[in-house]
C-alpha cells in the first residue's frame, strides 16, 4: 500500500454517534422541543454527539450539563438504535446510544442553556408523552421501549 487516496462520493451521507439521555425523576422523563433542521418542533430527550475519546457516560454527563445545567448521579446503558435520515438535505446516519440517568440532586431544575437549539425543557410522564416526538424516539416508544427499571 502506497500513498493511496480514498474518495467518498459526495452523495454519501455521514455517520455519527449520538448519546441520548433518558433522565428520570419519579415517573417522569425530561424532554425538550427541538429547534433544528433535523426534527424541528418535535419533542426529544437531551442528546448530543460523542466526542473522540469520550465514554458514553462522559458524553451523557457533558451534554446534559451543556444543555440543561443538570448534573447526573447514576447512569447506565439502555439500548442502541440505528437511525437513517435519508430524506434530509444532507442524508445522515446516527447510531443512538440511549442511557438512563438520574439527577445527582433531585431538587435541580433544568435551565434552557441553548435556546437556539431548544424551546425549553419539561418533565413528562412516560405514559403520556407530548406529540410530536422526534422520530428516533417515537420509533423506540412504538417498539415498546421503556427507560424505567422493571
From Swiss-Prot:
Localization per record: Cytoplasm
InterPro entries: Nudix_hydrolase, NUDIX_hydrolase-like_dom_sf, NUDIX_hydrolase_CS, NUDIX_hydrolase_dom
Keywords of this entry: Cytoplasm, Hydrolase, Magnesium, Metal-binding
EC number per UniProt: 3.6.1.68
Residues at which Mg(2+) binds: 63, 67
Residues annotated as domain Nudix hydrolase: 14-147
Gene Ontology biological process: dGTP catabolic process
Tissue: Expressed in petals. Little or no expression in stamens, sepals or young leaves.
CDD domains attached to this UniProt entry: NUDIX_MTH2_Nudt15 (cd04678)
Motif (Nudix box): 48-69
GO cellular component annotations of the record: cytosol
GO molecular function: 8-oxo-7,8-dihydrodeoxyguanosine triphosphate pyrophosphatase activity; metal ion binding
Principal place of residence: cytoplasm
Protein name (database record): Geranyl diphosphate phosphohydrolase
Catalytic activity: (2E)-geranyl diphosphate + H2O = (2E)-geranyl phosphate + phosphate + H(+)
SUPFAM superfamilies recorded: Nudix
Comment on pH dependence: Optimum pH is 8.0.
EC category name: hydrolase
Amino acid at each position: 500500500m502506497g500513498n493511496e487516496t480514498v474518495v467518498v462520493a459526495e452523495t454519501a451521507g455521514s455517520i455519527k454517534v449520538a448519546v441520548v439521555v433518558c433522565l428520570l425523576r419519579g415517573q417522569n422523563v425530561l424532554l425538550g422541543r427541538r429547534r433544528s433542521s433535523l426534527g424541528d418542533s418535535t419533542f426529544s430527550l437531551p442528546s448530543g454527539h460523542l466526542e473522540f475519546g469520550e465514554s458514553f457516560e462522559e458524553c451523557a454527563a457533558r451534554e446534559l450539563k451543556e444543555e440543561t445545567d443538570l448534573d447526573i448521579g447514576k447512569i447506565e446503558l439502555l439500548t442502541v438504535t440505528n437511525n437513517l435520515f435519508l430524506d434530509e438535505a444532507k442524508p445522515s446516519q446516527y447510531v443512538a446510544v440511549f442511557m438512563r440517568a438520574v439527577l445527582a440532586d433531585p431538587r435541580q431544575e433544568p435551565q434552557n442553556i441553548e435556546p437556539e437549539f431548544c424551546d425549553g425543557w419539561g418533565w413528562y410522564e412516560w405514559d403520556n408523552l407530548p406529540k410530536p416526538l422526534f422520530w428516533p424516539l417515537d420509533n423506540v416508544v412504538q417498539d415498546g421501549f421503556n427507560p424505567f427499571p422493571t
